[in-house]
Each structure stands twice: as structure tokens, then as C-alpha cells.
Amino acid sequence: MAVSAFRGTRLPLFHHSQFPVARTVSGTSKKMIGARNFKGFVLTAQYSQTQDLFTSRLQSQIEKLPKLVEDIVQTSINTGPRGVTRLVQGVQAFVGVGGEWLNDLSKSTSASGGLPSELQLGLLSPLYLRKLFERMGATYIKLGQFIASAPTLFPPEYVKEFQNCFDKAPPVPFEEIRKILQEELGRPIESVYEYVDPTPIASASIAQVHGARLRGSQEDVVIKVLKPGIEDFLVADLNFIYVVSRIFEFLSPEFSRTSLVGIVKDIRESMLEEVDFNKEAQNIESFKRYLETMGLTGQATAPRVYKYCSSRRVLTMERLYGVPLTDLDSIRSLVSSPENSLITALNVWFGSLLACESFHADVHAGNLWLLRDGRIGFLDFGIVGRISPKTWAAMEVFLASIATEEYESMASALIQMGATNRDVDGKAFAKDLEKMFSSIQELDTEIVVATARGTNSDTTAVAANVVMDERQMNALFLDLVRVSESYGLKFPREFALLLKQLLYFDRYTRLLAPNLNMLQDQRISIASNKRTNGYKDSFN
């Protein structure tokens, strides 16, 4: 093919007028020879450049191959026989969901109309991939939740679908939990606990929680226990995902440019931290130190960790009693001003962004309570975030811009926060942000009011609760990511975590303090790089 192109004249891209005719010392004939052969010379040079580029890339891949093989071998050794077990389970899950897809496909082809996109994509479609993840169990459910909470990293169709990846699982029989407790404690559980309630308070994919009472001190506690086999499955699954990502990056440079392995490492680190209860205990202790250092122990708390009966698979914590920040009637029975309680929660959380090693990154109503003694209780530190001063500096400007509706400043802050390799039109970006943020007002919080008459009296209790639509909240993330990506911006995951917590607080504000502007009220002190010791004044 190259020879015929060299000989022919069917290459209109190469015009003689674009190039100087070769100079010669003597004779017109030599000039003509130079001109006649120039077309072939240019094509040969371009072919040579392409060949050099291919050779260079091939050489680069060959140099990377030993490292890839080493990673695969080492990962396989670390995985061990449990990898075979998970492979069999994976095949079973694949066959099950594949059969479901084929059944849906046959129904769709027999009906009139075109084939839906989720059927065209097969098991790679968001719908069937989510179903496959759920069949694969705990690791993949957690992975699905990671996808749902990271609109800055994944396509919107997958983020939306994985909102349905619920972390609910049937409880493990108590005899298995008892066995784990005895193994981890190294002695009969009766020597540590006066009793353990065999009925779990909660059960999720990786752990379940039981109420208990300590022997001797008679203190009420909760025990969080990692379910049996979770660690083996988790290591095997994460190692498999890592190997696949390494192979993809090796085969296609495109995956390398999208930092696929980096994303997988982030997922692996996040998930391994969540199943290491020693790490969660450290997160709790860090938060409690922050409260003590800032003099906030009278305003907020976190559960005490009982280290002598805790381990990597078991976490024994003080049992706190209170109500979620969404239970308005109960809050009113505990404090005279729900608004002040909310302001306290906001100040404590904002202060932790810079004054604590990590911030609580899951402040939904189940994890943020008003306790019986009037303090704010922060629960469940399995998911935390860490933010760099540089990112938070941009976030400060972003939040201030939201409050003042200065969209050019907002655009500037997002450009500073995001990673991009091209120039961004700040004014056009600001106009798009203004259109998008007008939709926030449409994210109405539903306040449900219920009345109940007492059985032995004529009194009537009125309870108000706020209902927050997670899909609406994530729709806002996706809109922001969509607009930003159109300008080539990519944000760190911490940005999505921060924004989600702020939206939780926005919903609490609508219920507990409708007239409060949490970004402008002088009683609320937003963390600043310029100060980390000014939060005490916010509580006086």
C-alpha cells in the first residue's frame, strides 16, 4: 500500500507549492529530479515518523511489561485460594444477571419499537451492572455506593443508577457473631459483657450492630461486628479490580490519561479503611481530641471507644441516646431553641474541616443526633474526608459566592479547585453556573407532620420530620459536574463529599431554622485557613 501511494499521484494533501524546490549547483535536470522525487520523500518521512512513534510506544510498553507482570503475580499471591472461590461466585452472578438480560432482551425484541439502550449495552449498562454488583455482595455494593457518591469521577448515568444500590443485608445468625466476638476478644464474651442483645440494631452488607452492657461498670454500649468472610471477599475483589485496571491501562493509553488505576486505588483505600474498625476508632479519637482542644466538649460529643474490647473486626462504643436532627417534635422536648442546636452542629462541623485530622463525611440524620443532655452527637465515623488547605481556600470562596450569588467569583473558585489542561472562559462558565444554581430552589424539602393521640390521655403529640430526596441531591452534583466538565474541569472527590454534607445541613436548616442563612449568619463560623482557633467564640 505504501509503494502504490509512493508511485501514484493521489495525495492531494501534499502540494508542491507548499515546499521549496531543491536547490542544485548545476543543471535544470537536477532541479526536476529534486522536484519529481519530493512527493515520495515527504510521504516516506511521514511514514518514518509514524513508525518511530509506534516503535517508541511499543518500547515503552515493553519496558512497563515486567512491572505489570510483577504486580499481577504479587496480587495473585496476596489473594491466594480465596480468589478461586470468588471467581466461581462471580461466574454464577454473571450467569444469573446474563440470563435476566437475555430474558428481557427476548421480551423487548418481540414487542414493537426499538431496543432500549440498557439492553443494547448488555451487562455493561448501568442497570444490569448494578444488578451484577448486588449479586456479587458486600464489596461490590460498597463499590456501587462509592460510584453513587462520586459524580466527579463517574458518568452521570451510572451515578444515578447506583443510587439504587442499597446497603441492606439480612443479619448474620447471632451464633456466628458470638464466635467472632470470642475470637477477637480472646475469652468468653460473658467475661466482658453482662449481656449482648442477639437481635441486631442494624445490619448492613459488611457489619451489624448489637446492643450490650459491659460487665462490672454496667455501661450501655453498642458493638459493631464485621460479618464473617467479608475480609477475604474484600481482598480478593479489590485485588481483581486492581489487576483489571492495570491491564486496561497497559493495553490502552486512554485509560492511563483518565487515571483509572488512581481511581481504583482511591476506592481500595476508602473501602479498606471502612472495614478496619481500628481506623474508625482512630477517627473517633481524633474528633474527640479536636473537641477537647477547642473546648467544645460541652456542646458536642462522639461515642467513647472501649479499646480493651475492640479490635480490627469488633468496635465497642458508648451507647448514646438521643434523636435525629430531623425529628422536630422530639428536639423541642429536649431544648428550647432547635435553631441554636443546629448552629452548634454547624460550628462544630465547620471547625473540624481544618482543626481536625479528618471531617465527618456522612452527616445524614442517622449519624447526627441531638442527645438527651442537649449536646450534638456525631455517630459512625466509617466515612471521613480529608481536605487540603488549598482546596478549602477555593471552597471558602465558592461558599461565599453562593451566599452572595456572585457567579464570576464562584466560577473562579471552581477553576482554582479543579484540574484542567486548557484555558477556561470564566464569564461563560459563570453564566452557566447561574442557570444551574437557580435549580437549587426547586429542591424542596418535604416536611411531614404527623399527629398521635395518647392512649391514656387527651393530649395530642405533633411530630414533624424532614424528608430528603437523595436522588435530588445527587442530581445537583451531576448538574454541577456536567457544567464543569464541559469546560474541562475535574474536581477532587472531597469536593463532592463537602457539598453533600452542606446539602444535608441545608435540609436541617429548612426544618429547624427556616429563617437562618447558614453561609451568612454571623453566629456561624466557617473554617478558614487564616484561623483555626477562633471557634470557641462562636459558642459564647
From Swiss-Prot:
The keyword Nucleotide-binding applies. InterPro entries: ABC1_dom, Kinase-like_dom_sf, Mito_struct-func_regulator. CDD domains: ABC1_ADCK3-like. Signal peptide: none annotated. It comes from the Eukaryota. Keywords: ATP-binding, Chloroplast, Kinase, Nucleotide-binding, Plastid, Transferase, Transit peptide. GO terms for cellular component: chloroplast; plasma membrane; plastoglobule. Residues 195-533 form the Protein kinase domain. Pfam families: ABC1. Residues 1-58 form a transit peptide. ATP binds at residues 201-209, 224. It is found in: Plastid, Chloroplast, Plastoglobule. Its EC number is 2.7.-.-. The active site is at residue 362. One of its GO terms (molecular function) is kinase activity. Belongs to the protein kinase superfamily. ADCK protein kinase family. This is Uncharacterized aarF domain-containing protein kinase At5g05200, chloroplastic. It comes from Arabidopsis thaliana (Mouse-ear cress). The lineage of its organism: Eukaryota, Viridiplantae, Streptophyta, Embryophyta, Tracheophyta.
